[in-house]
Amino acid sequence: MKKILIILFLFLSTLKGEAVENPKIILKTIHGDVKIELFKDVAPNHVNRILELSKNGKYDGVAFHRVIDGFMAQTGDVQHGNTKNNFNPTMVGTGGSDLPDLKAEFNNIPHERGTLSMARSQNPDSANSQFFICFDKAPHLDRQYTAFGKVLEGMEFIDKIK
């Protein structure tokens, strides 16, 4: 049986002075903490969505429901993937938040080890709350999915997700 991994985000930084830095968050897993930088400069709407859902606790207790070894680990189904509230193993991976879907913000961030990118359906403008973290290079996703962040520390904990 698959281990269920839960996530929790904590904010690390706030705006300092006039210079705007990309926000950093902590993704807490059962294996350890993962420090992530969010690229607000290239995917502002997607980063704002992640921050909003995080701030409101929507990701707390949400499982990594799809893991493809050597490719990626996917999480963020706040509707069906919350292990603390209404977890639905037959529906996990099909839900999103109650917020509207986001328009694509495709960019030049490469999908490589540690890249965070939004999951979506075949419709490029269907990203909502689900996202994935790449285990390795995935150039076939470049400019096809909205990359919005990068693991800075703790990728070894993502590698333990099975």
Predicted regions and their residues:
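Sec-dependent N-terminal signal peptides
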Residues: I4-S13
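Cyclophilin-like peptidyl-prolyl cis-trans isomerases
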Residues: L12-K162
